[in-house]
Amino acid sequence: KQAHLPLLVYLRNPATGGVFASWGSLGHITVARPGALIGFLGPRVYEQRYGEPFPAGVQTAENLARHGVIDGVVAVENLRPTLDRALTVVADRPGEPPAADPPEPIVEAPAWDSVVASRRPDRPGVGWLLRAGATDRVLLSGTQGEAASTVLALARFGGQPAVVVGQQRVTGGLDQFPGRSAAANRVGPAALQEARRGMALAAGLTLPLVLVIDTAGPALSADAEQGGLAGEIARCLSDLVTLDTPTVSVLLGQGSGGPALAMVPADRVLAAQHGWLAPLPPEGASAIVFRDTAHAAE
């Protein structure tokens, strides 16, 4: 890793104790064998120490993948193509970029019309962007678990490998990943930690970082406050502006609040039509100025 080479980890059965608490948890990508026992403290040790069995179903590959602790579950017979796909993204040389398409004219629209358009449930999001615009995609742990509102992936765009960190919007169609339910489009501490993992991954593999902004705003709850939401926003900003690898931010839709601002200060910032950025949603600004939300369109 110090030499910026990819470290891929495959956890077999069992993978516990010091192995899981050292190199087994330090890979750039970590997958496990189906049904593998994975955890820090083995269940027999726990039962002997505490006089009761460890809760069933916790220390399994499938459960840890659902919670985003590992990146996925891969059968032995599927390991070779999985590794090949991952290494194609992170280790192959960049290809020649394709010729750029001629720019299309952008029709001016009132700001509120753009806000309304960005909230349409059928508007393409980061999932659509990965499927339509990228090749050799490898989805990592951000597609599941507590950080499910942030998508983390390795992909190639026009032959150029990159790490993708994208805020996952709620839709039932274009933007939903196969095999997963749509996540709430509010960004909490775990989602920002996943974004920071993407930044570290880009730095460790010396790959460009693409950040896709599309969020209705931060999770506003006791859990978010106690989980250090403000601190995670600050650390995202700090990590991003000090990153040594090329960075591009894409305002794909809504760009509301601290979680959006935390992903903006890249080397290049692009905006899709109807993409917008604000420290809080228009309804919030209306509440501050007029003490109601009826003036949001103004």
Question: Could you describe each region identified by the protein language model?
Answer:
Residues 80-173, 180-184:
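Intrinsically disordered, low-complexity segments enriched in small/flexible residues
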Residues 60, 75, 79-82, 111-113, ...:
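General structural feature for long, well-ordered alpha-helical segments within catalytic domains
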Residues 40, 57-58, 127, 133-137, ...:
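Aromatic-residue hotspot detector
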Residues 1-92, 213-298:
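Conserved catalytic cores of soluble enzyme domains
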Residues 1, 8, 153-156, 160-241, ...:
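Cleft-lining beta-strand/loop regions that shape enzyme active-site pockets
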Residues 110, 125, 185-188, 281-282, ...:
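General structural signal for secondary-structure boundaries
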